[in-house]
Amino acid sequence: MRHYEIVFIVHPDQSEQVPAMIERYKSLVTSQGGQVHRVEDWGRRQMAYMIQKLAKAHYVCVNIECGKETLAELEHAFKFNDAVLRHLIVQTKKAETAPSPMMKEVQREEARKAAQTTTEGQAA
């Protein structure tokens, strides 16, 4: 089995459906003997360019280990899900379990926002 990193972009109106989508894709991989090593929900982010007249979308990154048949089925599921605007599948040499640089940035932003709200609350 090979290791893959998958990033998919979900329509912003479907953001509340993302946890269910992640579970569906995880169960698809595990039911066929694969493994899910890392799941990162990067949240709503500004896109580099507009897709379908949208400037923001919900980003998700998943690292998996699976066979070619499972990967083909997963790609088929992405193509026929209208909520998925784009997807990218990259083969990796080994399983990635540490937080990605993007996830570290998301965590920094959340920590900064939390610190900002506490300082505003103390000032009031």
From Swiss-Prot:
UniProt GO MF annotations: small ribosomal subunit rRNA binding; structural constituent of ribosome
Swiss-Prot/TrEMBL GO biological process terms: translation
GO cellular component terms, A-Z: cytosolic small ribosomal subunit
Ranges where the record places region Disordered: 96-124
Entry keyword annotation includes Acyltransferase: no
Comp. bias regions, Polar residues: 115-124
Family of this protein: Belongs to the bacterial ribosomal protein bS6 family.
The entry's keywords: Ribonucleoprotein, Ribosomal protein, RNA-binding, rRNA-binding
HAMAP family listed in its UniProt record: Ribosomal_bS6
InterPro entries reported in the protein's UniProt record: Ribosomal_bS6, Ribosomal_bS6_sf, Ribosomal_S6_plastid/chlpt, Transl_elong_EF1B/ribsomal_bS6
Covalent S-S links between cysteines: none
Protein name from the UniProt record: Small ribosomal subunit protein bS6
UniProt function note: Binds together with bS18 to 16S ribosomal RNA.
Source organism: Cupriavidus pinatubonensis (strain JMP 134 / LMG 1197)
Keyword hit for Ribosomal protein: yes
